[in-house]
């Protein structure tokens, strides 16, 4: 009898717990965004110690991928898999049609990363504040991009966070992309891995050591909470493997984790919206 009453009491308490709402699983907190003057997201949840690793690429068809390509994707995927970390990938639509990238793109999806794009043809949207691509031309380019994403089984609700081509756009271009149903992000200001294409004869040239030093200086001075950290998944010519930032991805992940950072993707952002 005591056992029976105990069962009733326990069941009753559980029922009251659920009815009171205490047993409900907490809904994800709506993301907080830090935007630049153009209105593009540059950091996500700056109060949380997470980093958003993003990887972009384009395939230059005029030189069969000599200068721009997606050849870094497999080493990036292998490192992320080894470290148990997820990333967000934004190749241009042109990358999706190259035979050599079919399997890596499928891996991006199958291994749980976020996949979107970077326009189809890597359009230069603006220059010196002037819009260079009309809304109609942009819509045609994005329609081609969407065909490729959906060829891999994705729906727009899964890939609507997008990086503008060349990580550059003005307010008009942003509004045109938003009218097509997209939300925009760009790499956070500070890190300089996007200069990995430069060579020693260029004024903007930075060595890989300088790029890494800049990242750790930024972490120590400002912190990297919510940072969108861009690394090109490309093999630029006239570069040795040690000079390619993605070949230092494992070191970057290890150091960030040792300093208490976690990693998130734009899948997490969509889930919380």
Residue positions per predicted region:
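C-terminal motif of bacterial Sec signal peptides marking the signal peptidase cleavage site
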Residues: 19-21
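Short, conserved catalytic or interaction motifs in soluble domains
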Residues: 24
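Catalytic domains of cell-wall/extracellular-matrix polysaccharide-remodeling enzymes
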Residues: 97-103, 122-230, 234-262, 268-271
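Active-site beta->alpha N-cap acidic-glycine motif
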Residues: 27-114, 121-127, 144-159, 252-255
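Bacterial N-terminal signal peptides that target proteins for export
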Residues: 1-11
